[in-house]
């Protein structure tokens, strides 16, 4: 098996599409750069086909966060943007292709994460994940091939740097109360109250239904406390935290074409 990680810098600011793609869309530099990504992926598929491995290669295309500014595309109907724990900052598309293994044209509403890729790719390639440490992700191959509808994980946690800001289980998402809410840019926001949203009915996170659902709030607060105990929160180290990796004697190499 082979593994290729291809991180496009597009469409991150500054918007700099290649010369031959400028003016090829009706959406300015952003749209032009999207056109270039589309071309780039086409070249990748051509190469796979030329090598005769097109039918036996899993291709996964996704992103790391929502757009940061309007000129980088819209996050609607989601609320918020990059750097925030609203759905618009956290939720991204994921397109997966594997002819004969993943049904063409199928879709899934299951919530998954990039941390699931390690155990998933290991499972489908016949490998094993390390047994001497905790692996945070889960094997989501049954979701990708359409045999499973939901993720085995019971709760997801939304952190802004080292601050736990929200927790989600199913379609219910709770923003926990905070004396000061951290942000990526600018000063922290002021005190925040508990807010509960039903994402199945309120994808833009407009209607706080915490008062009407005390049992759901209680359940999600318990998940939040479990996260703090394991992963930590501001000024509170978690019992499950690992030390950052460190290379004592690094030997970087410059690859020249």
Label the predicted regions.
Residues 1-25, 202:
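A hydrophobic, helix-centered structural microdomain
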Residues 4-14, 61-67, 136, 158-162, ...:
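Short, solvent-exposed turn/loop segments enriched in Gly/Ser/Thr/Pro and often Arg
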Residues 28, 35-42, 112-119, 135-138, ...:
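A structural signal for well-ordered alpha-helical segments within the folded catalytic domains
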Residues 67-87, 102-110, 115-195, 199, ...:
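C-terminal cap/loop subdomain of S1 sulfatases and analogous C-terminal strand-loop tails that border
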Residues 117, 169, 178-180, 188-195, ...:
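Long, internal low-complexity/basic segments
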